[in-house]
Amino acid sequence: MAGGPRRGGRRRKKVCYFTANGITHIDYKDTELLKRFISERGKILPRRVTGTSAKYQRMLTTAIKRSRHMALLPYVKEEQ
């Protein structure tokens, strides 16, 4: 393809946000942190997108679900 996108470029290795910043506990009340890992539709972003490790992804998922249950985060965001 003459005008197509280039492929084969090196991708940067994703680094876990929590291990890089020394965060050991994810609090469900910290909604500003949790919003970074939720899509604009309100879905939890997967590890391959965010780069978080498996341990912290499990903790993050639990914290987001608790926060939703306590009505700190919405289950689904409104369409605008």
Curated annotation (Swiss-Prot):
GO aspect biological process, one term: translation
Q: Could you tell me the superkingdom of the organism this chain comes from?
A: Bacteria
Q: Give me the Gene Ontology terms describing cellular component.
A: cytosolic small ribosomal subunit
The yes or no answer to whether the keyword Ribonucleoprotein is present is yes
Query: InterPro entries from the xrefs?
Result: Ribosomal_bS18 (IPR001648), Ribosomal_bS18_CS (IPR018275), Ribosomal_bS18_sf (IPR036870)
Record's keyword terms, sorted: Ribonucleoprotein, Ribosomal protein, RNA-binding, rRNA-binding
A molecular function GO annotation:
structural constituent of ribosome
Instruction: Describe the subunit structure.
Output: Part of the 30S ribosomal subunit. Forms a tight heterodimer with protein bS6.
Q: Which HAMAP family match?
A: Ribosomal_bS18
- What is known about what this protein does? Binds as a heterodimer with protein bS6 to the central domain of the 16S rRNA, where it helps stabilize the platform of the 30S subunit.
Report the family membership: Belongs to the bacterial ribosomal protein bS18 family.
Q: What is this protein called?
A: Small ribosomal subunit protein bS18
Top-level taxonomy: Bacteria, Bacillati, Bacillota, Bacilli, Bacillales
User: What is the gene name?
Assistant: rpsR
